[in-house]
Amino acid sequence: MSEHTQGIAGHGSFFQPTHLAADEAAKATEWVRKHVDRRTIDLGERMDDVREHMWELEKEGEIIVHRITDAHKPVEVQTLFGWTKKIPTVQLWHHKSCGQCGNIPGYPTSLLWFMNQFGFEPGRDYLDETDQTSCTAWNYHGSGIGNVESLAAVFLRNFHQAYVSGKQHGHELGHFFPLVHCGTSFGNYKEIRKYLVESAELRERVKKILGKLGRLVDGKIVIPEEVVHYSEWVHVMRNRIAGELQKIDVSNIRVTMHAACHYYKMVHEDAIYDPTVLGGNRTAIGTSVAQALGAQVIDYSTWYDCCGFGFRHIISEREFTRSFTMNRKIRVVREEANADVLIGNDTGCITTMDKNQWIGKAHEQNFSVPVMADVQFAALACGADPFKIVQLQWHASPCEELVEKMGISWTDAKKNFEAYLKEVEAGRIEYLYNPELALGGH
């Protein structure tokens, strides 16, 4: 098979050499270092709000909007353009991340742990079930083997399940509202929602697919009022987390934040900004919970830079992504900020910055920093077990010193976990969540 048949680096056929000049290549990749904030975005002319068109389509009988109701106990936040976005805090349907479950299991576990700590009842206040699929966004962005129609069908299939999932547990349609764990899914779903609202042709095409799958309600597709990311839930719950659950003083911990491009650069008008966080200039996510917990939030010069993952670059240009991660992120937060930890809010970012630090050692670049999600750091501060819940043993970056600096004995936690594993081997398993609920039971 020729290169022009399969595309460069094994990608789809439409990925062909561009032969760009150096200045053209720099312009084409400027998003890597792009600044998206209140200072650099033109806020003068009001952008189109896709939600307004959703209400019109619903009135015309085209779609059903999955609404956030008072039962979801929403908290209103402000986005980049000053628009109001509603974040539900209960009755949540967990839309899991394939990368988190496979590479960073302590990421979703920490989130579920928090809901349990708040007294949320599984099957009533939240649902974590297996009847869902990957968003498949990486297939599209990473390898070029997907298309918008397939992405839209997957989006609608999963959000239909969220809409109807409460029925088998004795609730009404729309009881559980989707909470998206992955930043890539979050950005992809927001783009796809916009395409669906704008294109009658796309809606008709996916309707045929969903009809065959039994994923229509009264012959209509279901689109959520808001696309909500888990870190937005953490943001609106941050004061309750700090006020009700925090057990460890983290005022001596130097925290740096990497905000995911997929969160605030894709469909940037939907990202949360807060005047009490970073002056309201940068997205508040992640930083806000570290700030609420009392940690020292330290700025650094490459805050806006991509983590290095870059969708398909992690597959076909691994050396570039690893060197970018080490030189534009890890080195900077270590040398400029002297960070104790680098937190983030996306699957790909955490994976890239955590798993690739070994490459620095291979090239005698002896700098490293613990990397974890905002919700994992928050869970540690609230007394979650570093091994059973936060699951730092899955991380490749060195987390031992951070844990010790927080006043938690890594050695004792490891011994306790090893003893727990023997209990598991003996069949005495401790569940965070009823496994029958995950499979549709009660």
Task: Name each model feature, range by range.
Residues 2-442:
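Iron-sulfur cluster-binding electron-transfer modules in prokaryotic oxidoreductases
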